[in-house]
């Protein structure tokens, strides 16, 4: 079967890998000059099934109001006359119940655990190297209140058999020795030993090279203008130059830009671009740098070790498709780094970056078929595209091939999210 994958980020390239492995003839289209140059370029670097959770949670509306007032706020909302944003926010608020949170977190953890295992298998199959480490994630709590609420997450982790450790200050220092330098600045943490870290951009580029050697065609610098359709099927992809490309099946994996592509087909995806920022800086003192990933719960910032670099990523800015780099967001990232790893790296040498995370209101991605019988979606992963990429690609390849998927998937499919526009 000939398959066109629209989008060359980590999710699209992982989809191409598993489709090619299943024996399909695959072509990937992307508007950039190479793979992984948009949202996958400089994300936080976490492969974190244990930390997979929806932003929509009990208490979030009140917390969000508090965050919006903070100087170093993890959430930024730019007032906009954009009905789609406010509709998306309303859907998110509707998912802030205890019942919805447990349901959404459960399916996210299920996909993320499957994806982490698929990544490990892919690594064994290919020998791919991408500055990965298998040393877990430490969610760090600065306040007793944060630590006292950890049971809300561990109950779901128990349900899905995800390993974890609740640590006191000494336990956190044992996991991340450099934190001894800031003893007293935190009270405890939640360690997720099964989590990993790695450079998503490097992974995407090297996996694309592996795919190319296995016969996958990559066409870069190609803009997808629209999808042609007839009688409930997609009949072709029209590019920005007017060229029409055809296939037997089509995968929409264009991140935050997927809804605009599908809207003319009468499909409305509840995916909104949530802007994130990162700093990437060289390690200046090995003993003062993180070992793996430390999640600063107060500022919602991830500080990750990637080889001889430190990646500091975070913030959630609701500003449409703006790519503007904003100084206050950099200040927040630098503040978190300075508080926890003040001597680990030199922020003056940091590369400052921003990307658009494709978020659904309930945190769950949209992976599976649509009402068009040869059109599939693989988008809406939010902050967890790197975590869920391999599992989503493998699941999608099974669905397109007609094989029974290895995990429950009905609640991940387009039928749950797609509706008539």
Curated annotation (Swiss-Prot):
Disulfide bonds: none annotated. One of its GO terms (molecular function) is D-amino-acid dehydrogenase activity. It catalyses: a D-alpha-amino acid + A + H2O = a 2-oxocarboxylate + AH2 + NH4(+). FAD binds at residues 3-17. GO terms for biological process: D-alanine catabolic process. Its cofactor is FAD. It comes from the Bacteria. Its EC number is 1.4.99.-. GO terms for cellular component: cytoplasm; plasma membrane. Keywords: FAD, Flavoprotein, Oxidoreductase. Pathway: Amino-acid degradation; D-alanine degradation; NH(3) and pyruvate from D-alanine: step 1/1. Oxidative deamination of D-amino acids. Belongs to the DadA oxidoreductase family. NCBIfam families: PRK00711.1. This is D-amino acid dehydrogenase. It comes from Methylobacterium nodulans (strain LMG 21967 / CNCM I-2342 / ORS 2060).
